[in-house]
A protein has these predicted regions:
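C-terminal motif of bacterial Sec signal peptides marking the signal peptidase cleavage site
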Residues: 13-16
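Positively charged n-region of N-terminal signal peptides that target proteins for export
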Residues: 1-6
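Conserved nucleotide-cofactor-binding alpha/beta core module
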Residues: 117-238, 265
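Class I SAM-dependent transferase core
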Residues: 19-125, 134-137, 141, 155-158, ...
Length: 266
C-alpha cells in the first residue's frame, strides 16, 4: 500500500513540474504580421500651380532676370500674408498686413529687386520691412547680409519671428525710423525703399557705396508717385525716372521733420 501511495505522489510531483516549465517558457509566436504605421509621403505643394501662373504673369510684365524669377518662385509668399488672405497669396496685387501697411504686389517686388542688380556678396539695406517678404527675396539672391528697418514695432517683431522660423539667418531686422538709414553698417551696395517719402532722404544717399544702387518711390501721398533708380558714380548721384507707382506713405519723425527737403533729384 505504501508503495502505491509513493508512486502516486511521485506522479503528481512530475505533473506539477511539467506545468511549471510550460508556464515559464517563451510565449507562442504568432504568424500574423503586426500592422505597420503608414509611411508619410511628401505632400504636394498646394500653391505650386498658382505660383507658376504668377511667375508667368511677372515675366509677361517685363521681368527678365532668371535669378529673380527663380527666387520669386521659391520664396513662400503665403507664409508672409495674414491667414484671411491665404487664398490670395499668389495673386498679383498687394495685400493688407495690418497697422495700415501692405505686402507689395509680387510684380513690384520682382521689378524693384531686378533694378538693384544684386551680386553675391553685396550688402543690402531695406527701408520698410513690413511682413519680411521683400527681405526674404533679397536674401535668397545670395547677398551676404540684408539689413532691414521697420518703424512699426509690432510688424518688426512679427517679421523677425517669421524670418527666424523660415531659417533666414542673414537678415537683420531693426525697429526704428528708416529715414536715417543704418549708419553703423554703412556703406551699402544697394538700398531699397518700400514706402514713399515726398523727397529723396539725404541720409540714404550718404550711406550708398561707390557704384551703389538706390531704388525708391518718391512723391506726394494719395497720388501716383514716381519710382526712381539712383546710381552713385564717382561720387555723384545719377537718377533714372522709371514711371508711376503707388506705395504706402513713408512715416516717422524723420520724414515729417524734413518734409519737402532732402537731396535734389539729379
Amino acid at each position: 500500500m505504501k508503495t502505491l501511495v509513493s508512486i502516486l505522489v511521485l506522479l503528481f510531483l512530475l505533473a506539477a513540474c511539467s506545468q511549471v516549465v510550460t508556464e515559464t517558457s517563451a510565449p507562442t509566436m504568432t504568424t500574423q504580421k503586426p500592422e505597420l504605421a503608414a509611411t508619410p509621403t511628401e505632400e504636394t505643394d498646394p500653391y505650386e500651380q498658382e505660383r507658376q501662373v504668377l511667375i508667368e504673369e511677372i515675366k509677361a510684365m517685363g521681368v527678365k532676370d532668371e535669378a529673380v524669377l527663380r527666387v520669386m518662385d521659391s520664396v513662400p509668399r503665403h507664409e508672409f500674408v495674414l491667414s484671411e488672405y491665404l487664398g490670395q497669396a499668389y495673386e498679383n496685387h498687394p495685400l493688407p498686413i495690418g497697422y495700415g501697411q501692405t505686402i507689395s504686389q509680387p510684380y513690384i517686388v520682382a521689378w524693384m529687386t531686378e533694378l538693384l542688380e544684386l551680386e553675391a556678396g553685396e550688402k543690402v539695406l531695406e527701408i520698410g520691412t513690413g511682413s519680411g517678404y521683400q527681405a526674404a527675396v533679397l536674401a535668397e539672391l545670395g547677398t551676404v547680409e540684408v539689413y532691414t528697418i521697420e518703424i512699426v514695432p509690432e510688424l518688426a517683431e512679427l517679421a523677425t519671428t517669421r524670418l527666424e522660423k523660415l531659417g533666414y539667418t542673414d537678415i537683420y531686422v531693426k525697429q526704428g525710423d528708416g529715414y536715417y538709414g543704418w549708419p553703423e553698417y554703412a556703406p551699402f551696395d544697394a538700398i531699397i525703399v518700400t514706402a514713399a517719402p515726398d523727397h529723396l532722404p539725404a541720409p540714404l544717399v550718404e550711406q550708398l557705396s561707390e557704384d551703389g544702387r538706390l531704388v525708391i518711390p518718391i512723391g506726394p501721398q494719395g497720388w501716383v508717385q514716381t519710382l526712381w533708380k539712383f546710381v552713385m558714380v564717382e561720387g555723384e548721384l545719377k537718377g533714372y525716372n522709371l514711371g508711376g507707382v503707388q506705395f504706402v506713405p513713408f512715416t516717422g519723425p524723420g520724414a515729417e521733420e524734413h518734409q519737402g527737403e532732402g537731396t535734389a533729384i539729379p
